């Protein structure tokens, strides 16, 4: 039996701003549903990923921006960096380590992401 990771909740302070940010960097919008006056559920998925992020109103008691250590894997770190730059997000220079090449960025609330290319994997 497989146990696949489906969803990671991100605490954000402004749902529309987060939705716009993640759309701008290429995430696909899966759902944006207002359940009630207290609950709004937005689900977005990075291109090619089986796991999504969700944020909204009434979904998390965590402090906005408190999620650290989120990571996505890409097949071309330079292309990913250029895509982020084109979206107005500065991921810094590529950090080349023996176990992978990385760029990093924060969403508008400070939730921290790593983008990794693993050169030892076949693409």
Predicted region positions:
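Vicinal oxygen chelate
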Residues: 7, 32-33, 40-43, 81-123
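Core segments of cupin and vicinal oxygen chelate
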Residues: 2-3, 9-51
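Short, charged/polar surface micro-motifs in flexible loops or helix N-caps
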Residues: 47-51, 61-62, 76-79
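Mid-chain, well-packed structural core segment of small domains
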Residues: 69-82
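Short, charged/polar, Gly/Pro-enriched secondary-structure boundary elements
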Residues: 49-53, 110-113
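Short, solvent-exposed beta-strand edge segments and adjacent coil->beta transition regions
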Residues: 3-7, 65-69
